[in-house]
Amino acid sequence: MGKLGAYVEISRPKNALMSILGTLTGWVNSTSVYDGRLILACLIPPLVLMAGNAINDYYDAEIDAINKPYRPIPSGRISKREALNIYIALSLFGIALSIFLGFIEFLIVTAFSLSWYAYARWLKRTGVPGNALVSLGVAFTLIFGSLAAGNLTNKVIIFSSVAFTSNLIREFVKAVEDLPGDRAHGVRTIAVRIGVKRTGILVFLLSLATVVLTILPVIFRLTGIIYLSLSVIISLPILMLASAICLKGKLEERARETSSLIKVSMFLGLLGMLLDPFRVV
């Protein structure tokens, strides 16, 4: 696909799709009304996220040359300037659309558009603060959808907390996966600072916290059989399998496998949250 394929790759469409699902999840768990605001709300997060991915690749070009030489910039398929232009264009488009949703939504979108620049240029190299910002961005897709629907619910707040801890786990595992390039360029990730073994223990503890948060909606009877089946019974064992790899001290050699397990767990968990309002029992 050439240049167009590189543009698509740098925007990471799979992540963009997840942001749409997150926004939709926040909406359907807050209201039963489906109108034009829903379409608008689902368009904005992927625009901002794709912009963030582009600026991230812009500043990560040298590191990616070691860790991921197949990425669009180090492979020479697009230039750094083109990546910067993508960030600017998509950010401005997302901010412009948010004006039609309301002032709070406009502030959130503007804040995250600027935050992704700050993350790519400075925060990513600080380790945990950068990981926390990325995870907050994932969690806020649900909150954004709920706010756009006009009714931020307790259930969505719990769901967004689960999204935050789950993604933080994935960020820590990715830090282990990217360890060679990060060490070479002085990036102070959690894995560089405390080592792979301690990072694995931290991932396990965060997994336990995620389990507790995931079960809370069931305890408070906020959810039904779909959430229980997908988000609890199926998703959580996969997460704990990934965390068991970390606890056994095998994270460094199985980082990619662990990351894949976490992504599957996150998707199933989110799917349960999304479909739960449509339960029949």
UniProtKB/Swiss-Prot annotation:
GO terms for biological process: glycerophospholipid biosynthetic process. It is found in: Cell membrane. Gene3D superfamilies: UbiA prenyltransferase (1.20.120.1780). Pathway: Membrane lipid metabolism; glycerophospholipid metabolism. It catalyses: sn-3-O-(geranylgeranyl)glycerol 1-phosphate + (2E,6E,10E)-geranylgeranyl diphosphate = 2,3-bis-O-(geranylgeranyl)-sn-glycerol 1-phosphate + diphosphate. Its EC number is 2.5.1.42. It comes from the Archaea. This is Digeranylgeranylglyceryl phosphate synthase.
